[in-house]
Design a protein with these regions (language model features):
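N-terminal regions that are enriched for targeting/export leaders
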Residues: 1-71, 76-77, 447-459
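Transmembrane alpha-helix boundary signature
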Residues: 46-51, 118-130
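Extramembrane terminal tails and long inter-domain/linker segments of multi-pass membrane proteins
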Residues: 1-27, 129-145, 174-209, 282-283, ...
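Central hydrophobic cores of alpha-helical transmembrane segments
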Residues: 361-371
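Hydrophobic alpha-helical transmembrane segments
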Residues: 75-83, 337-348, 414-415
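Membrane-proximal extracellular juxtamembrane segment immediately upstream
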Residues: 374-389
Length: 459
């Protein structure tokens, strides 16, 4: 599957450092536009905090809407980094090399964005401290530490800390490379961040062992984070469609599906914007598409299991909710779009190699997947709260306000803005990984055919 490309070190340095040493012409206008969107979003968030949640479409009984849906979505996107970097690093998959750093970055910035939504959803963000530490002793009131709302920030904070450390350890050799190629304040910055890296055998060994250990340590956190997020819903028996024991694995595999698809989207953009055709190649998209076929099919199985579990109990409210999701307007339209975009359109297309190696088709199908996965979270959260029951006299339909949609758009602008800022100071494709790949790969003769192979020393 891997095609042999011989690239010398000078060419690799020149191409992969062009974002840091020579700014592309499109970079500044794009960052300015994104910066304006980010400032507009921050202004809207400030107005909402000042005015209260009354400016949103949230009302009884739908108190969880667009904000919590987007929170779950970004936590799911963050699973891309560990899926691509940690698991594929442990399995020594060669095709991971161009995509590891972008996936790790997506993890860190997605988690930073996800943390914003519970804060603003609280209405009074300054009182979040009461979730983390005891109330004043005079009142004798303490937070319920068994609540998922307490476990969420703990799990996400741990995941964010580990992911940041994981990213930084892998960045050290490239920081030293930049230190040796820059002058002035940039040289001082890279000198501090490189931590005295000289590339001697002892440092390389420690960096390699550190990456493997962090990969292994991050795997249980990777599983636990979205499991805990799923328990925000699974431990609420009063809402139909939420109280399900299958939610933890269902959410985790759905997160991997959306996260890896987001990495495909980002890889295509990196290839087009920075002209990295020699580093991000069609075979990398082919490998990720094969991975996505497996993950998406597993996710589809859990989707059917979740539906079967709901219907198996013959509980009238559960059956009424499923009828509402699939047969009542507008939920039925959203359900059809969700199912088409998350599986029925992209996965059959990925079965053909000419689609898997077509970067444009992979780009658009990966976007379709994340449209579908966002709708999946929306259909899990909102219909269960919005379903009208005969004994609830204070209900209203949920209509997301312009404030909610603006903050939703802000989240995408914010993540993209952070990615472009990072690309200005640090390489998005790890240089040392590319150079190591050139050392490890070679052409070998098998019979009369010459094929690419990975050569490693035996222990």
């Amino acid at each position: 599957m891997q095609q042999r490309r011989s690239l010398d070190q000078a060419y690799t340095n020149r191409k992969l450092l062009n974002g840091q040493l020579d700014t592309p012409k499109w970079w500044a206008p794009t960052v300015i536009v994104l910066g304006i969107l980010v400032l507009i979003g921050i202004g809207v968030i400030s107005v909402m905090i000042n005015k209260g949640l009354g400016v949103t479409g949230l009302s009884r009984p739908v108190f969880w809407g667009l904000f919590i849906t987007t929170f779950v979505f970004w936590v799911g996107i963050s699973h891309a980094g560990i899926m691509i970097s940690a698991i594929l690093r442990l399995t020594q998959a060669e095709w991971r090399r161009p995509v590891t750093r972008a996936a790790e970055l997506l993890t860190v910035f997605s988690l930073l964005t996800a943390l914003v939504f519970p804060l603003i959803h609280a209405g009074r963000p300054w009182r979040i401290a009461y979730w983390i530490m005891p109330y004043d002793f005079g009142r004798g009131i303490y937070p319920n530490i068994r609540s998922p709302l307490i476990m969420d920030p703990v799990a996400i904070g741990t995941y964010l800390t580990g992911s940041t450390l994981f990213l930084y350890v892998a960045l050290l050799p490239d920081l030293a490379n930049l230190r040796d190629r820059t002058k002035g304040w940039r040289n001082s910055l890279y000198t501090v961040l490189a931590l005295g890296w000289r590339g001697n055998p002892r440092q390389w060994k420690m960096q390699t062992v550190g990456g493997i250990l962090l990969s292994a340590l991050m795997l249980p956190i990777f599983v636990s984070v979205h499991s805990i997020v799923s328990w925000d819903f699974a431990v609420v028996p009063a809402v139909e469609g939420w109280h399900s024991t299958i939610f933890a694995p269902y959410f985790v595999i759905g997160a991997v599906h959306s996260g890896v698809s987001a990495v495909v989207t980002m890889m295509a953009l990196m290839r087009w914007l920075w002209k990295w055709d020699d580093f991000i190649r069609p075979e990398h998209f082919d490998a990720l598409a094969r991975l996505l076929i497996v993950v998406a099919t597993g996710w589809l199985g859990f989707t059917f299991l979740e539906l079967i579990f709901a219907l198996y109990g013959q509980d009238a409210p559960e059956i009424a909710l499923r009828e509402m999701q699939m047969f009542i307007w507008p939920w039925n339209m959203l359900f059809i779009i969700f199912f088409l975009t998350a599986y029925l359109i992209p996965v059959p297309m990925w079965l053909f190699k000419r689609v898997r190696t077509n970067i444009a088709l992979m780009f658009w199908t990966s976007i379709l997947v994340n449209i579908g996965m966002w709708l999946e979270r929306f259909l899990i959260i909102v219909p269960g709260l919005a379903r009208r029951t005969p004994f609830v006299y204070t209900w209203d339909s949920y209509r997301p306000s312009a404030v909610e949609w603006t903050i939703f758009i802000w989240s995408f602008a914010w993540v993209t803005f952070l990615m472009l800022l990072f690309s200005k100071f640090f390489p998005l494709v790890p240089l040392f990984e590319q150079k190591e790949s050139q050392v490890f790969t070679d052409d070998v003769m098998i019979g009369r055919a010459k094929v690419p192979a990975v050569l490693r020393e035996a222990d």
